[in-house]
Structure formats: C-alpha cells, structure tokens
C-alpha cells in the first residue's frame, strides 16, 4: 500500500539494496499520492504504478502498466496514466452509473463504479441480504457495487474521486465512519450530542478520522 511505500522511502533501516530485485511496484488499497510515488522512486529507482480492486473482486480489477515502445513505428503505446488506477484487466469491465437509478453516465462524468468480470465474488458467506445489496444483475450480467465514485476517460483509464460508502482507509484498513459515530454516541450517552465523522489525508497512515461535535468531547462532567 502507499502507506508502506512511504515508510520504506523514509526509513533508514530499508536500504536501496533491499528492493534491488524488483522491476516495478504496484500500489493499491488507498490513494497513491504523487509525493509518495516520487519519494519511493527517488530512493529506490523503481517505478510505481497504481492499481485498483476490492476483496470482492479477488482482489484486482485494474492497473497501470509500463508504456511500450514500438521500435518499428517509433510510437509509444500508452498504458500508464498517473492519477488514475489504470485500465480494467482483460475480461473485466467498468460501468459508471447513477447510484440510484443505475443508468449509465457519459464518459468523463462521475458516478458509482460497477465492476463486472469472472473474478466477482459469488457472495458473502451465509449473508444473502448483504450479498443482494452488493451485487446487481443488469441484462443477466453480474456487477459488483463498489461504493466508490469515479469516472472513465476516453482511453478507458479509471479515476476514483470519492467514496459513496462512508469509510476511511487508515493504514490500508477500512474503518466505517458510521460505526465510529455510533460507538462514540453510545459511549457518551448524551441525547443532545450530535457527531459527524470525516477523514483527512495523513502522511503516516494515509487518512485520519476527524470528529465534528456539538459539544466538547474532552470536557469532564
């Protein structure tokens, strides 16, 4: 994950020789920030490419790859677009839809990301209701609802801009913001208290949770 790449880049205990056998690195699970990519590549001289997927997609769906030069035509085949999570794997499809109606959204516009392909899970074990919420059948084809918001460009590269499902990714772990809010409300036992949890970038863990409250949570009563 980018969190680990950043740790490797700044750690004096991880030498350049430690990763000399690698040809390239693929990062996923959280957003790859440009400063993390640059720090890692500067230290190890290994290119970093961003990919995308979920546990429900076993776990990959797309990836950026090194560009290929055609020596005969002197042209370069574009396979990497920094800032995106690459193109879909062979046999995998992305569909960008309205999150409510599931109607397709035009190229370049943001919407809910659906993933289709042979790697899509059959379902959550003994959880049919949760499975039904995650899997959409459209024209007899199974699609996984990622909960992520993004768009495809004209070349098929996917950009993720936000999450419909309210989670923070801290050190690569998914933390439900709704659960955080509920646990704090239960612990405070204050019927007048209102809390909203959100997340901000964090240089160490990728993201950090920030709480907005109608009262001072640190005060003693």
Model segments located where?
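Conserved ATP/PPi-binding loop(s) of AMP-dependent carboxylate-activating enzymes
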Residues: 84-91, 103-135, 173-175
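Alpha-helix/helix-capping structural signal
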Residues: 3, 30-31, 119
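Active-site glycine-centered loops adjacent to acidic/histidine catalytic or metal-binding residues
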Residues: 29, 53, 86, 148, ...
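AMP-binding/adenylate-forming catalytic core of the ANL superfamily
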Residues: 117, 122-123, 149-221
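Conserved ANL (AMP-binding/adenylate-forming) active-site segment centered on the GW(Y/F)…HTG consensus within
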Residues: 45, 78-82, 120-147, 164, ...
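Gly/Ser/Thr-rich phosphate-binding loop
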Residues: 9-80, 93
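Beta-strand->loop->alpha-helix junctions that form or flank phosphate-binding loops
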Residues: 49-56, 86-88, 198-201
């Amino acid at each position: 994950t980018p969190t680990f790449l950043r740790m490797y880049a700044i750690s004096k205990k991880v030498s350049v020789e430690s990763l000399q056998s690698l040809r390239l690195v693929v990062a996923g699970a959280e957003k790859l920030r440009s400063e993390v990519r640059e720090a890692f590549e500067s230290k190890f001289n290994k290119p970093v490419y961003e990919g995308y997927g979920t546990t429900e997609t076993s776990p990959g769906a797309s990836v950026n790859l090194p560009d290929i030069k055609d020596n005969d035509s002197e042209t370069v085949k574009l396979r990497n677009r920094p800032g995106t999570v690459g193109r879909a794997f062979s046999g995998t499809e992305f569909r960008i839809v309205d999150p409510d109606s599931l109607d397709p959204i035009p190229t370049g516009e943001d919407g809910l990301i659906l993933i289709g392909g042979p790697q899509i899970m059959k379902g959550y074990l003994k959880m049919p209701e949760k499975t039904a919420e995650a899997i959409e059948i459209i024209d007899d084809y199974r699609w996984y609802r990622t909960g992520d918001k993004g768009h495809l460009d004209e070349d098929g590269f996917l950009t993720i801009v936000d999450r419909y499902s309210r989670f923070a990714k801290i050190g690569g772990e998914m933390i439900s913001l709704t659960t955080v809010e509920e646990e704090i409300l239960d612990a405070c036992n204050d019927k007048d208290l209102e809390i909203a949890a959100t997340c901000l970038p964090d240089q160490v863990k990728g993201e950090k949770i920030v709480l907005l409250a109608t009262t001072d949570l640190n005060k003693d009563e």
